[in-house]
Curated annotation (Swiss-Prot):
Processing and modification events after translation: Contains 4 disulfide bonds.
Protein name as it appears in the record: U-scoloptoxin(16)-Cw1a
Gene Ontology molecular functions: toxin activity
GO cellular component, one term: extracellular region
Keyword Ribonucleoprotein found: no
Lineage: Eukaryota, Metazoa, Ecdysozoa, Arthropoda, Myriapoda
């Protein structure tokens, strides 16, 4: 058991100086899609939406070639005083997000 652990530890310590993330980024620089949290492939630098959860998604590659998924949710709506929360409409983000309407303010914020 100790011999196996020592061999494993030696293998880890002798791993090349390039990190695992850097190696993956190098291997996947040609990839033009990302695997979204919905389990589907999506083109980089394009938005897609989950209307049921009122979320917007976006995949991009950083300067080092690592691909990230950005998930945007509705801001928290807090109504104080005479203000009221107006539920969002059906559809995609941001139209589905709730808004705060105040009687003394002509704009929703």
């Amino acid at each position: 058991m100790n011999a196996v652990f020592i061999v494993f530890l030696s293998a880890i310590l002798s791993y090349p100086h390039e990190s695992f993330a850097e190696e993956l980024a190098t291997k996947h620089k040609h990839v033009e899609h990302c695997l979204g949290s919905d389990g589907e492939g999506h083109p980089l630098n394009e938005f897609w939406y989950d209307d049921g959860m009122c979320q917007r998604f976006y995949c991009f590659r950083d300067d080092e070639g690592i691909i990230y998924e950005q998930i945007t949710n509705c801001p928290i709506a807090i109504a104080e005083g005479d203000c009221k929360i107006n539920p969002g409409t059906a559809g995609s983000y941001p139209d589905c997000c709730p808004t705060v309407i105040c009687p003394d303010s002509p704009k929703a914020f």
